[in-house]
């Protein structure tokens, strides 16, 4: 027996030595790694919480099926050649006597897709899942076609050996246009062969793509786990992938506002035995210079940097540096560019995205994740959204806004793991980080979390309280507050918002949850960042007769429009209202335009089937043909929307319009542009809602009656409407889901996409567009009826009762003008005008004070006791500085 073993090992050694390309070889270093969650710079673990390094081994912690660790720095190429791999395997959990558990190597995963997409191959079989070559718990080798449910190229169940340690040796070599797979399983101490097998005639297209380790607990026992060490990959078919080169550094986000740079680097969950120091370096005179040092913050695994008095006039290259020690000390770098503040540009371009899913439906009518059964990896994994990101970069944005749901706790790509929520969040957050890394490392970014980011379906934060103990699911959500601990919520906010300018009022809320509402100034566009979930009241306890379930009133006899309008419900809360009041009148730092960003629209722009009590039917609704109209819908009354509370909504919109500010949001999945109405239609500002980037909840807008005051070319669902809560809104454009033949069809037919907002410094015009997910700006167009072009002044479109004199200014360019009602002292509105003339309009009779000046120079003139007239032509006011 030993002689046969020696001959077999020699034969395999000869095969593995043929035509080696040394620089492509891989050898794991887990034997040199400190204990911890992170599996190392070369690999991606599915899932993050399912693996760790312990006692010099890579150990699987999960007893779920088909846990994988993909090798990201090497791939199996499509060229003809040899592939060799070997690994030492140990049983880490209970020994399985059913033969259902197995461990081994997955080859050819995601052969026709990007290696990052392929790295999500785990748990389920399906198209693109590769070939699983492994050793079952009874000592039988197999070669399984993991693209099919239960098909094996080779599997002879002849052994019944309760092994605890084995060495798996794999050799794949070409033969007459196909490939032959040879596998040995050896006792690592005695070199006795446990089993051997060969499969020939494997199609060459199956031996390309990713390679990964597999710990498979099986579907029967579910108690067996495996550990690995000494993994090697080599051969002429292996190619090095240099794009996965940041190691522990995942991404960075930054803002540069009012000469303050704030940058947050996101790290993998590095071990406590690794370094705690992260360094930010800047390129000065063609040399890298240390600019700041930060410590790894846990459990967010972030490093936060701040530099005051930043030179905003130049582009500056930077890199984040982090050292780890394995065989030797190696420094990893994450590179990016701090763009200069675009005060010199006539157009400030903003991108807005929200609600990203890393997968789409596996098939029509099925909305499960990767862990929901058969999964077509080659068509249903949208991560890392390569075409989308490449097209986004073509816009050359000055600022990018991510409006929330960067993470979906369920089915993106897997169901929520509430036993390990911190690592489950990071696992899904890292997918977002990697997707947008090319943007976020080199463009200022505003990122804010929404309900799904903090593991809620809907969220009424109620001032940051905890949900009542003992409640779960929608019952907990309806009660108000946060289901997850404050530490978890703060971790999420740290990963997503710690690079934002300092909060306007930093005091924590409720259970110690931090806040992030603030102002960010980019090129003179002042952006108010607000939180429209954290302070919002929960409706269920306020309306006991409504029978509210997950934010939807189930009592059909309860009149939502009239009964839901009360004065003791909050939307933004008093602290944010105070901030917005102060922000609306602050035009310093040459601010010439204002915008508000938040999670969701301040209206309920959606319809549902007439007989439905809530939106549970939305994922099941048939996607209509393009141009067709869905009949039989009613207006939605979703308390999760910011159509409620109406008083809080109106209060906020009155402040927005005082600053002539546009509103930019996400959340609803339904791309739209509306103009708000408060007392009358179209008397407040415009809003644009981005389509979902990845949509599993395709809301639509098919009201049961036509809108009024429509343009001739507008369809019936455009124009003036009151939503289900009685809020006035005018629909200018909406992107309903519709049938389409552009691949991936199951993604694009849901009208997924993104928004662009272009602010014009010279004209003060604003161009709003919603684009399809697949759109290339160099050859494609936005969705129909976009772009919508407005002027800054259109955001305060009340009908005036009178006019103040025209103001003509000399000695000052583009001054700021404030109109103050003397009886109340309230600033009616303020703005930085373009040029030197402006005629104010007012909306009530009485005396007004006009202030004209430049806040950056603290030069002001005031004219009091100015009374409006009903005619425009009157003696102008000449102001000289």
Language model features with spans:
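Bacterial Sec-dependent N-terminal signal peptides
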Residues: 1-21
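Extracellular carbohydrate-recognition regions
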Residues: 20-47
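Short carbohydrate-recognition loop motifs
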Residues: 49-68
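Long, structured stretches of catalytic cores involved in phosphate-ester chemistry, encompassing
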Residues: 56, 220-238, 258, 267, ...
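Secretory/extracellular carbohydrate-interaction modules
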Residues: 62-147
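Carbohydrate-binding surfaces in secreted/extracellular proteins
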Residues: 85-87, 159-198, 766
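Short, aromatic/His-centered strand-loop micro-motif at the edge of beta-sheets
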Residues: 141-169
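Flexible glycan-contacting loops in extracellular carbohydrate-active proteins
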Residues: 192-226
């Amino acid at each position: 027996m030993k002689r046969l073993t020696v001959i077999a090992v020699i034969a395999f050694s000869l095969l593995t030595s043929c035509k080696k390309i040394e620089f492509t070889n891989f050898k794991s270093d887990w034997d040199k790694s400190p204990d911890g969650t992170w599996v190392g710079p070369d690999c991606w673990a599915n899932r993050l919480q399912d693996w760790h390094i312990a006692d010099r081994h890579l150990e699987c912690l999960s007893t779920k099926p088909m846990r994988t660790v993909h090798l990201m720095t090497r791939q199996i190429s499509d060229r003809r050649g040899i592939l060799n791999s070997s690994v030492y395997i140990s049983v880490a959990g209970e020994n399985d006597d059913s033969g259902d558990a197995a461990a081994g190597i997955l080859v050819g995963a995601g052969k026709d897709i990007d290696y990052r997409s392929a790295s999500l191959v785990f748990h389920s079989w399906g198209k693109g899942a590769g070939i699983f070559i492994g050793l079952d718990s009874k000592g039988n080798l197999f070669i399984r076609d993991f693209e099919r449910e239960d098909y094996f190229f080779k599997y002879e169940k002849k052994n019944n050996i309760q092994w605890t340690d084995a060495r798996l040796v794999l050799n794949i070599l070409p033969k007459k246009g196909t490939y032959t797979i040879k596998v040995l399983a050896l006792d690592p101490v005695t070199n006795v062969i446990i089993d051997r097998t060969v499969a020939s005639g494997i199609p060459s297209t199956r031996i390309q793509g990713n390679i990964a380790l597999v710990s498979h607990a099986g579907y029967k026992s579910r108690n067996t786990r495996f550990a690995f060490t000494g993994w090697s990959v080599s051969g002429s078919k292996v190619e090095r992938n240099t794009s996965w080169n940041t190691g522990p550094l995942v991404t960075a986000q930054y803002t540069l506002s009012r000469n303050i740079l704030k940058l947050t680097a996101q790290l993998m969950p590095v071990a406590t035995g690794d370094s705690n120091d992260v360094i930010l370096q800047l390129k000065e005179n063609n040399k890298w210079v240390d600019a700041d040092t930060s410590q790894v913050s846990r459990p967010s695994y972030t490093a936060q940097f701040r530099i005051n008095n930043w030179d905003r006039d130049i582009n500056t290259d930077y890199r984040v540096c982090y050292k780890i020690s394995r065989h030797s000390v190696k420094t990893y770098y994450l590179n990016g560019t701090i763009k200069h503040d675009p005060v010199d540009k006539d157009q400030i371009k903003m991108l807005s995205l929200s609600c990203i899913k890393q997968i789409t439906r596996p098939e029509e009518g099925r909305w499960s994740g990767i862990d929901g059964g058969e999964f077509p990896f080659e068509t249903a994994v949208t991560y890392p959204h390569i075409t989308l990101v490449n097209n986004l970069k073509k816009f050359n944005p000055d600022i990018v806004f991510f409006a929330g749901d960067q993470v979906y706790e369920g089915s993106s790509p897997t169901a929520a793991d509430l036993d390990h929520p911190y690592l489950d969040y990071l696992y899904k957050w890292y997918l977002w980080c990697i997707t947008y890394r090319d943007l976020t490392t080199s463009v200022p970014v505003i990122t804010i979390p929404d309900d799904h980011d903090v593991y809620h379906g809907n969220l009424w934060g109620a001032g940051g309280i905890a949900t009542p103990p003992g409640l779960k699911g929608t019952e907990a959500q309806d009660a108000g507050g946060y289901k997850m601990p404050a530490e978890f919520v703060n971790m999420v906010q740290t990963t997503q918002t710690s690079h934002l300018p300092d909060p306007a009022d930093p005091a924590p809320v409720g259970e110690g949850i931090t806040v992030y509402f603030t102002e960010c100034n980019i090129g003179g566009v002042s952006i108010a960042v607000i939180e429209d979930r954290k302070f919002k009241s929960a409706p269920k306890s306020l309306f006991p007769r409504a029978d509210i379930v997950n934010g939807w009133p189930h009592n059909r006899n309860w009149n939502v429009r009239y009964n839901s309008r009360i004065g003791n419900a909050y939307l933004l809360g008093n602290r944010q209202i105070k901030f917005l009041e102060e922000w609306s009148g602050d035009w310093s730092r040459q601010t010439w335009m204002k915008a508000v960003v938040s999670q969701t629209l301040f209206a309920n722009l959606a319809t549902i089937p007439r007989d439905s009590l809530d939106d549970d039917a939305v994922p099941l609704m048939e996607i209509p043909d393009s141009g067709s109209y869905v009949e039989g819908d009613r207006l939605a009354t979703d308390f999760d929307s910011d159509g409620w509370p109406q008083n809080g909504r109106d209060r906020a919109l009155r402040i927005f319009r005082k600053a002539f500010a546009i509103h930019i949001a996400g959340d609803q999945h339904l791309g739209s542009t509306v103009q708000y109405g408060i007392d009358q239609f179209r008397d407040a500002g415009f809003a644009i809602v981005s389509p979902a980037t990845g949509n599993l909840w395709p809301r639509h807008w098919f009201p049961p009656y036509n809108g009024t005051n429509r343009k001739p070319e507008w369809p019936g669902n455009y124009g003036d409407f009151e939503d289900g809560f009685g809020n006035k809104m005018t629909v200018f454009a909406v992107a309903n889901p519709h049938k389409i033949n552009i691949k991936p069809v199951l993604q694009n037919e849901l009208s997924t996409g993104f928004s662009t907002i272009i602010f014009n410094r010279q004209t003060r015009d604003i161009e709003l567009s919603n684009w399809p997910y697949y759109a290339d700006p160099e050859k494609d167009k936005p969705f129909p009826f976009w772009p919508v072009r407005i002027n800054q002044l259109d955001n305060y479109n009340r009908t005036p009762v009178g006019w103040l004199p025209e103001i003509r200014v000399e000695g000052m360019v583009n001054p700021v003008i404030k109109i103050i009602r003397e009886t109340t002292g309230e600033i009616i509105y303020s703005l930085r005008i373009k040029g030197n003339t402006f005629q104010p309009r007012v909306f009530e009779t009485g005396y007004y004070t006009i202030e004209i000046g430049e806040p950056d120079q603290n030069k002001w003139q005031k004219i009091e006791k100015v009374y409006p007239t009903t005619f425009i032509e009157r003696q102008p006011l000449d102001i000289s500085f």
